[in-house]
Swiss-Prot record:
Gene: MT-CO2
Cysteine-cysteine disulfides: none
Family from the record: Belongs to the cytochrome c oxidase subunit 2 family.
Upper taxonomic lineage: Eukaryota, Metazoa, Chordata, Craniata, Vertebrata
Top-rank taxon, per record: Eukaryota
E.C. number(s) listed in UniProt: 7.1.1.9
Species assigned in the record: Cerdocyon thous (Crab-eating fox)
Protein name: Cytochrome c oxidase subunit 2
Catalytic activity: 4 Fe(II)-[cytochrome c] + O2 + 8 H(+)(in) = 4 Fe(III)-[cytochrome c] + 2 H2O + 4 H(+)(out)
Alphabetical list of PROSITE patterns matching this protein: COX2, COX2_CUA, COX2_TM
CDD domains: CcO_II_C
Cofactor requirement: Cu cation
Chain sites annotated for binding Cu cation A1: 161, 196, 200, 207
Family annotation (SUPFAM superfamilies): Cupredoxins (SSF49503), Cytochrome c oxidase subunit II-like, transmembrane region (SSF81464)
Length: 227
């Protein structure tokens, strides 16, 4: 869950988000070391009185600053590619949910059930109850079982949208005429908030997403009541 004046990423709830956080820290450390080295060299160049005017080239230095950046890029690319392949893998999902973006709300369909579908609209500010979050609460939450692989099929009825839930490491474009897919798995129960992350018109900011992750027994009870 995000909080005011937050500077870092949200706490990870899924294995993919855990991997993304580790990759972020890994890459940030490399960038920090490179920046420190460059600033150190610049400070030396600005403060030293020594000059080396007789040397026109230095092959050893050129070799180092050619090979070293290549090694650094490999160290960044390999874990990045690993995570990309992990995000694309969809192995035997336990549940499939289709979501469609509209101006300006989301609709959901549980394809494993005959008649389980609903629209999800933002609750206006004047109708919020004490403790509820402005611009993030919806009238119908997406209830899903925790610790199970869920496949999301995402598309749009009108313009470009983007279905994003940061704490699960999810962000998939909803494109008219195209069906994109992604998977999610929450490791603990709770409410997880997201929003449309693609400018889609005047009410773009009023398309929240709320996932309610519950144990399987609670999900089965909820789905039986909804059907």
């Amino acid at each position: 869950m995000a909080y005011p004046f937050q500077l870092g990423l949200q706490d990870a709830t899924s294995p993919i988000m855990e991997e993304l956080l580790h990759f972020h820290d890994h890459t940030l450390m490399i960038v920090f070391l490179i920046s420190s080295l460059v600033l150190y060299i610049i400070s030396l160049m600005l403060t030293t009185k020594l000059t080396h005017t007789s040397t026109m080239d230095a092959q050893e230095v050129e070799t180092v600053w050619t090979i070293l950046p290549a090694i650094i890029l490999v160290l960044i690319a390999l874990p990045s590619l690993r995570i990309l392949y992990m995000m694309d893998e969809i192995n035997n999902p336990s549940l499939t949910v289709k979501t469609m973006g509209h101006q300006w709300y989301w609709s959901y369909e549980y394809t494993d059930y005959e008649d389980l579908n609903f629209d999800s609209y933002m609750i206006p500010t004047q109708e919020l109850k004490p403790g509820e979050l402005r611009l993030l609460e919806v009238d119908n939450r997406v209830v899903l079982p925790m610790e199970m692989t869920v496949r999301m099929l995402i598309s749009s009825e009108d313009v470009l949208h983007s279905w994003a839930v940061p704490s699960l490491g999810l962000k998939t474009d909803a494109i008219p005429g195209r069906l994109n897919q992604t998977t999610l798995m929450a490791m603990r129960p709770g409410l997880y908030y997201g929003q449309c992350s693609e400018i889609c018109g005047s009410n773009h900011s009023f398309m929240p997403i709320v996932l309610e992750m519950v144990p399987l027994s609670y999900f089965e009870t909820w789905s039986a009541l909804m059907v």
